[in-house]
UniProtKB/Swiss-Prot annotation:
Its main location: membrane. The 4 large subunits of the cytochrome b6-f complex are cytochrome b6, subunit IV (17 kDa polypeptide, PetD), cytochrome f and the Rieske protein, while the 4 small subunits are PetG, PetL, PetM and PetN. The complex functions as a dimer. One of its GO terms (cellular component) is plasma membrane-derived thylakoid membrane. Pfam families: Cytochrom_B_C. This is Cytochrome b6-f complex subunit 4. GO terms for biological process: photosynthetic electron transport chain. The gene is petD.
Length: 160
């Protein structure tokens, strides 16, 4: 038994539509050659030309010029590495910090096994997964903001 519904080719209305050319490509213009030969190259070359033109006409300086003789007090990583940097900074043992970072994807792999709910359901009907996601988001934002503070107030964000 198949789960796909097959068309009834004995239906005269359907046969009339198929005779006129109705099929999988009935609506709109065909992708070949209209889109692939004419529209796509215009968009691709237009985007490349726009980016090149902006880079030539308005080159922006990113930050201050490098000074090899002046080192900042604390060198921070890129913004997307702030939570990981904060974990390594606040934990006393570096091996423990690496284990905590490895525990994040391992913990996320356990979420489907904790809940015995259909994974295709509405996410708001999966309370454990939703709670873990929200808790992880809050902790990640908290660690990311804390990485920008000095080490002595980084855990409390200077609030306490």
């Amino acid at each position: 038994m198949s789960t796909l519904k097959k068309p009834d080719l004995s239906d005269p209305a359907l046969r009339a539509k198929l005779a006129k050319g109705m099929g999988h490509n009935y609506y709109g213009e065909p992708a070949w050659p209209n889109d692939l030969l004419y529209v796509f190259p215009v968009v691709i070359f237009g985007t490349i030309g726009l980016c090149t033109g902006l880079a030539i006409m308005d080159p922006t300086m990113i930050g201050e010029p490098a000074d090899p003789f002046a080192t900042p007090l604390e060198i921070l990583p890129e913004w997307y590495l702030y939570p990981v940097f904060q974990i390594l900074r606040i934990l006393p043992n570096k091996l423990l910090g690496i284990a905590c970072m490895a525990g994040v994807p391992l913990g996320l792999m356990l979420v489907p096994f904790i809940e015995s709910v259909n994974k295709f359901q509405n996410p708001f009907r999966r309370p454990v997964a939703t709670a873990i996601f929200l808790f992880g988001t809050v902790v990640t934002i908290w660690l990311g903001i804390g990485a920008t503070f000095p080490i002595d107030i980084s855990l409390t964000l200077g609030l306490f």
